[in-house]
Structures are given as structure tokens and as C-alpha cells.
Curated annotation (Swiss-Prot):
Pfam families on file: Proteasome
Propeptide: 1-42
Domain of life, per lineage: Archaea
Lineage: Archaea, Methanobacteriati, Methanobacteriota, Stenosarchaea group, Halobacteria
Protein name as catalogued: Proteasome subunit beta 2
UniProt region (Disordered), positions on chain: 1-45
GO biological process: proteasomal protein catabolic process
GO cellular component: cytoplasm; proteasome core complex, beta-subunit complex
Species assigned in the record: Haloterrigena turkmenica (strain ATCC 51198 / DSM 5511 / JCM 9101 / NCIMB 13204 / VKM B-1734 / 4k)
Gene that produces this protein: psmB2
Catalytic site positions: T43 (nucleophile)
Subunit structure: The 20S proteasome core is composed of 14 alpha and 14 beta subunits that assemble into four stacked heptameric rings, resulting in a barrel-shaped structure. The two inner rings, each composed of seven catalytic beta subunits, are sandwiched by two outer rings, each composed of seven alpha subunits. The catalytic chamber with the active sites is on the inside of the barrel. Has a gated structure, the ends of the cylinder being occluded by the N-termini of the alpha-subunits. Is capped at one or both ends by the proteasome regulatory ATPase, PAN.
Family the entry assigns: Belongs to the peptidase T1B family.
Control of this protein's activity: The formation of the proteasomal ATPase PAN-20S proteasome complex, via the docking of the C-termini of PAN into the intersubunit pockets in the alpha-rings, triggers opening of the gate for substrate entry. Interconversion between the open-gate and close-gate conformations leads to a dynamic regulation of the 20S proteasome proteolysis activity.
Enzyme class label: hydrolase
UniProt-annotated location(s): Cytoplasm
Amino acid sequence: MNNWSQGSTPQGSDPSPYAPELGSLPDGSQSDDHGDTVNKTGTTTIGITTDEGVVIATDMRASLGGRFVSNKNVQKVEQIHPTGALTLVGSVGGAQSFIRTLRAEVNLYESRRGEPMPIEALATLAGNFARGGPFRAINPILGGVDEEGSHVYSIDPAGGVMADDYTVTGSGMQLAYGLLEQEYEEGLSLEEAQSVAARAIESAVERDTGSGNGVFLAAVTGEGVDIQGHNDFDAVI
């Protein structure tokens, strides 16, 4: 079980908002001289709700400029709430800063009110920060469990927050969505959802150069968040 208040994040520097491998379409007018030197997660990240909890899956690759693999073991999902986790999509530095900020707000809320922040409120807060903060082009997935049930939200760089039964962000999203549309069905168990999510990540890494090297799976329940990394897809499919 991960310690949500002290989770580690991969190292990176301040991002460029222009990056072809981001989970959103880039605007060429925003490019600068750092596009090939800033670590970006490229990425395929997936969130699936079940009656038992939430499954979040990500690949493991970080790249420079979308052309050079700078890290093969990046943990792109982090615990930010006692029963909630967030993915890293976009520039590593911006995603790290976003996670640190949300963790601080979750801690502050709990210390003031004596109870965990509701996941819907956390999603709204994350959207506000994405729109108004200095985090630049990020497109994470938030998954969590509270008294209202299981929740998955995608958060776009403009601050839009969308709830769904399952969602995908990142450069491999079209490939992963193709498999999820076929495999997802209501009533999946947590274990079945993990297998579906892992297969969708595997489908994306076959063709998307920004995704690869394995899968991290996070199981989010009312008991907490458990994150495990797997270099071999066969171990979890």
C-alpha cells in the first residue's frame, strides 16, 4: 500500500507547452527552444470505474522531444488522496508540480475539516488549477473512491473536467480506446478491469512511440491505493 502523502515522482524540469507527444493537440505557435530537452511522459493513461473501486493504468516511458527515450521506468500514477490517484500526462515538471499542489490542498482540507476531501470536489479543484495555474500542458486522469462510489475524471489543459465510466488520455489514446470500446462492460470486477486496462496499454505501446516499456497499475478502493509496476504484460493480462 502506498503512502499517499509521501509518494515519489520522476525527476524533470520546467516544461515547454509545445510537445507533439502530449495528450492534447499542440499549438505550434507556443513552441520554444526547450522542446527536445524537456522530459515529457508522452503516454497512454487509462481510468476505469468498477463497483469495487477504480483501476488506473499507465505505460512507463518518458521521452525527449518525442524522439529519444529518456527513461524506461517512469511511474505515471501517484497517490494524491487517501483513496485517490492521479496520472502524469504531459511535461514531467508540470505534472510533478500539479501533483504536489493537489496533495498540499488535500492535506489542508483534511486538517481543517477532519475528513477527506470528496473526490468530486478534488476534481473541480484540479480543473481550476489546470486552467489558472502555471502547470502548462497537462491532461491527467483522476480516479478515486468516496462515500458516493467510484469516480474517474479526465482533466484537460483548459481546466475542463469530464466524468465517465472509463477514459483515456495521452498520445496513445486512440489505440487504447479501440480496445476499451470492445472490452469494457458494466459489472467488471476490479481484477477484470486491471486486465482490460493492461491490454489497452499494451495495444497502445505497439504503435505509439510516446508509450512503452511496461505498465503501472493502480487499484483504488475504499481501503486505499495500491500501485504496482510490471515490465511484462503477460503477468497482468
